Amino acid sequence: MTTYATDSQGKFIPATQRPDGTWRKPRRVRDGYVPQEEVPLYESKGKLFAQKPSLPPGLPPEMAQKAREKREKEQRKAAARPAQNPVPGLLILHEDNKANQRQAKPANAKPKKKAVELPDVLLEQKQKEEQKAASRQQAQDQRNSKQQQSQNQSKPLDDVTKAVQDLQLGTASGADGHSDLSKKLRKLRKKIREIEVIEERLRASDGPRPDKDQIEKAKRKAEILKEIEELERGGGHK
């Protein structure tokens, strides 16, 4: 391992003597420099994987050893048990299953898969996860129910609000129509007053005479009066 020394200028490697008796000069070391012999060796993924623990996190080795011994014991029992049907068509009944076996099993019958026995720690962890999932589902159902109730309660209020808005729009539209009618009546009545002034000038013997456009305007007096009468009848004006 490389030996470092430190002075006022920083870290350095002291001078060393070669086998032939000559000396190597001291060398300065930059910050972050790692000597070649101290660089960690490369390890492949297979080697890193082999170094990982074989047991699940949190599982005691004693419990895993007991489960392994139990499994090996069952495998030895299964291997020591004689074959059920050593000869095709020959049925052998053992003392422990004579009452249950009444007929030979089909030759192509598939063996039932044995349920995997989990250690107590993994079994408790699985039960806790199932309980958490059930609690999350219950909370989600409650939120959905509350949201549905809130929507049902807000629907009548939305209907009332929409009806009020429609009524306000209708009132505003009616007010605009009434305002337009009043403006039109004022314009027509103003024209009638102007026509009456033109008629007075026509009856007068002195003063300026009306021009051709004013005379044409005076001829429309009856038409304008009829229009005023129709508007007053339709709008309720007096």
Curated annotation (Swiss-Prot):
Ranges of Basic and acidic residues composition bias in the record: 65-77, 123-133
Highest taxon above the source species: Eukaryota
GO cellular component: cytoplasm; exon-exon junction complex
Chain spans, region Disordered: 1-183
GO process terms (BP): exon-exon junction complex disassembly; nuclear-transcribed mRNA catabolic process, nonsense-mediated decay
InterPro entries attached to this UniProt entry: PYM1 (IPR039333), WIBG_mago-bd (IPR015362), WIBG_N_sf (IPR036348)
Cell compartments where the protein resides: Cytoplasm; Nucleus
Extent of Low complexity compositional bias: 136-155
Keyword field: Coiled coil, Cytoplasm, Nucleus
Gene Ontology MF annotations: RNA binding
Role summary: Regulator of the exon junction complex (EJC), a multiprotein complex that associates immediately upstream of the exon-exon junction on mRNAs and serves as a positional landmarks for the intron exon structure of genes and directs post-transcriptional processes in the cytoplasm such as mRNA export, nonsense-mediated mRNA decay (NMD) or translation.
Subunit structure: Interacts (via N-terminus) with mago and tsu/Y14; the interaction is direct.
Protein name, as recorded: Partner of Y14 and mago
Species, as recorded: Culex quinquefasciatus
